[in-house]
């Protein structure tokens, strides 16, 4: 995988925005990593590298090059470990699963930052306009967890359609009531599934749905290549509001931007078919939290599943914890062991390029030379 990323690189163009762009200078760099704490699970798997204890598996490599690597899960508040190091760090690495929120205030406070890396996909934890204005480079490991997320989406579709969770709960409680499950269990075959967004995640999901003989629809800014569209058997829907009433299942695969924040509000949900299944592994803030909870309670949404919340971590009183017929988990879909190894390798590759003054694979850039990537504008 690293070889593929290297093959995509170009030589560095000497057009950086000021001294804070990702052009490294000689000498030791201070790198701060913010990851989730593994605790008792840290030693359960030698490939568990996405946690504080695993530190992406790059500590020895970084320290052998003379760099200072600080890893923590303590990211909130003025007295946090992150706050102590933010002024003189050069690189911040964080993940969507335990994000360090990089606000305009933090960017202003930091005196030496050059590079903000996401170990995984996503950037909504970073104030991108502020990062661009400060001349920072922001990058992610594109493609590192797309398979993981698409598989998880398919799993949640099946869990909700087949009414699996009440059956599992019956077993745990020592109960046995077939009717209590069967009265709202359905096959996936023949259902109409629509994805809102058909980028890397959406396309992989559509490909995995094809063997189930579903009617596949997708809405996106851009139409998929006609040959691939024909191969998958998916139909392009230019008008989202026209697509939603057709769908038995709606899957959210669009990034969180100012345009998509709160996109699925009460009015948008009302356009969907009564009894719709919704799966959202994109970002929680794309949904109106209370509107989703209310629609689940009324039965307009027959089941809602996903691993993304707003805010994260979800507070104990978050309404999605208690709404009926949900298949929610913490933010886990993109941090399988396989995904961790991919995004750890991607981070190492970009750090290596950064130290050498080389460019990253073009698809990894979120902010470069003061400009946001097109999908974030």
UniProtKB/Swiss-Prot annotation:
<feature type="binding site">
    <location>
        <position position="145"/>
    </location>
    <ligand>
        <name>substrate</name>
    </ligand>
</feature>
<protein>
    <recommendedName>
        <fullName>Formate dehydrogenase, mitochondrial</fullName>
        <ecNumber>1.17.1.9</ecNumber>
    </recommendedName>
</protein>
<feature type="binding site">
    <location>
        <position position="281"/>
    </location>
    <ligand>
        <name>NAD(+)</name>
    </ligand>
</feature>
<feature type="site" description="Important for catalytic activity">
    <location>
        <position position="331"/>
    </location>
</feature>
<dbReference type="InterPro" id="IPR006139">
    <property type="entry name" value="D-isomer_2_OHA_DH_cat_dom"/>
</dbReference>
<feature type="binding site">
    <location>
        <begin position="255"/>
        <end position="259"/>
    </location>
    <ligand>
        <name>NAD(+)</name>
    </ligand>
</feature>
<keyword id="KW-0560">Oxidoreductase</keyword>
<dbReference type="GO" id="GO:0051287">
    <property type="term" value="F:NAD binding"/>
</dbReference>
<dbReference type="GO" id="GO:0009507">
    <property type="term" value="C:chloroplast"/>
</dbReference>
<feature type="transit peptide" description="Mitochondrion">
    <location>
        <begin position="1"/>
        <end position="29"/>
    </location>
</feature>
<dbReference type="GO" id="GO:0008863">
    <property type="term" value="F:formate dehydrogenase (NAD+) activity"/>
</dbReference>
<dbReference type="GO" id="GO:0042183">
    <property type="term" value="P:formate catabolic process"/>
</dbReference>
<keyword id="KW-0520">NAD</keyword>
<dbReference type="Pfam" id="PF00389">
    <property type="entry name" value="2-Hacid_dh"/>
</dbReference>
<dbReference type="GO" id="GO:0005739">
    <property type="term" value="C:mitochondrion"/>
</dbReference>
<comment type="subunit">
    <text>Homodimer.</text>
</comment>
<feature type="binding site">
    <location>
        <position position="307"/>
    </location>
    <ligand>
        <name>NAD(+)</name>
    </ligand>
</feature>
<keyword id="KW-0809">Transit peptide</keyword>
<feature type="binding site">
    <location>
        <begin position="331"/>
        <end position="334"/>
    </location>
    <ligand>
        <name>NAD(+)</name>
    </ligand>
</feature>
<comment type="function">
    <text>Catalyzes the NAD(+)-dependent oxidation of formate to carbon dioxide. Involved in the cell stress response.</text>
</comment>
<dbReference type="InterPro" id="IPR006140">
    <property type="entry name" value="D-isomer_DH_NAD-bd"/>
</dbReference>
<comment type="similarity">
    <text>Belongs to the D-isomer specific 2-hydroxyacid dehydrogenase family. FDH subfamily.</text>
</comment>
<feature type="site" description="Important for catalytic activity">
    <location>
        <position position="283"/>
    </location>
</feature>
<dbReference type="GO" id="GO:0016616">
    <property type="term" value="F:oxidoreductase activity, acting on the CH-OH group of donors, NAD or NADP as acceptor"/>
</dbReference>
<feature type="binding site">
    <location>
        <position position="121"/>
    </location>
    <ligand>
        <name>substrate</name>
    </ligand>
</feature>
<feature type="binding site">
    <location>
        <position position="220"/>
    </location>
    <ligand>
        <name>NAD(+)</name>
    </ligand>
</feature>
<keyword id="KW-0496">Mitochondrion</keyword>
<feature type="binding site">
    <location>
        <position position="146"/>
    </location>
    <ligand>
        <name>NAD(+)</name>
    </ligand>
</feature>
<dbReference type="Pfam" id="PF02826">
    <property type="entry name" value="2-Hacid_dh_C"/>
</dbReference>
<dbReference type="InterPro" id="IPR029753">
    <property type="entry name" value="D-isomer_DH_CS"/>
</dbReference>
<dbReference type="InterPro" id="IPR036291">
    <property type="entry name" value="NAD(P)-bd_dom_sf"/>
</dbReference>
<dbReference type="InterPro" id="IPR033689">
    <property type="entry name" value="FDH_NAD-dep"/>
</dbReference>
């Amino acid at each position: 995988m690293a070889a593929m990323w290297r093959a995509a690189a170009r030589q560095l163009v000497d057009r950086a925005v000021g001294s804070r762009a990702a052009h490294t200078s000689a000498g030791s760099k201070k790198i701060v990593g913010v990851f989730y704490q593994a605790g008792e699970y840290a030693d359960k798997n030698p490939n568990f590298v996405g946690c504080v204890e695993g530190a992406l598996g790059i500590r020895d490599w970084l320290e052998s090059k003379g760099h200072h690597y600080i890893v923590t899960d303590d990211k909130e508040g003025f007295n946090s470990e992150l706050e102590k190091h933010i002024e003189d760090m050069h690189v911040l690495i964080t993940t969507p699963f335990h994000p360090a929120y990089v606000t305009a205030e933090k960017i202003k406070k930091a005196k030496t930052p050059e590079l903000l890396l996401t170990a995984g996909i996503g950037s909504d934890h970073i104030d991108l306009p502020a990062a661009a204005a400060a001349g920072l480079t922001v990058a992610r490991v594109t493609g590192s967890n797309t398979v993981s997320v698409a598989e998880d989406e398919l799993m949640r579709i099946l869990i909700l359609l087949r009414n699996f969770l009440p059956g599992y709960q019956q077993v745990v409680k020592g109960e046995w009531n077939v009717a209590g499950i069967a009265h709202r269990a359905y096959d996936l075959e023949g259902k109409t599934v629509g994805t809102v967004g058909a980028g890397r995640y959406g396309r992989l999901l559509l490909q995995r749905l094809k063997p189930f003989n579903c009617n596949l629809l997708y809405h996106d800014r851009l139409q998929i290549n006609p040959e691939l569209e024909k191969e998958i058997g998916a139909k392009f829907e230019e008008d989202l509001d026209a697509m939603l009433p057709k769908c038995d299942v709606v899957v959210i695969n669009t990034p969180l931007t100012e345009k998509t924040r709160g996109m699925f509000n009460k009015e948008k949900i009302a356009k969907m078919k009564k009894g719709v299944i919704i799966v959202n592994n994109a970002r929680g803030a794309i949904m109106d939290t209370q509107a989703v909870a209310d629609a689940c309670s009324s039965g307009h949404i027959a089941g809602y599943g996903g691993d993304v919340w707003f805010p994260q971590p979800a507070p104990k009183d978050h309404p999605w914890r208690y709404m009926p017929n949900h298949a929610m988990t913490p933010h886990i879909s993109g941090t399988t062991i396989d995904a961790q190894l991919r995004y750890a390798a991607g981070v190492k590759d970009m750090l290596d390029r950064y130290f050498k003054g080389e460019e990253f694979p073009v698809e990894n850039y979120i902010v470069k030379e003061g400009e946001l990537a097109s999908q974030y504008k």
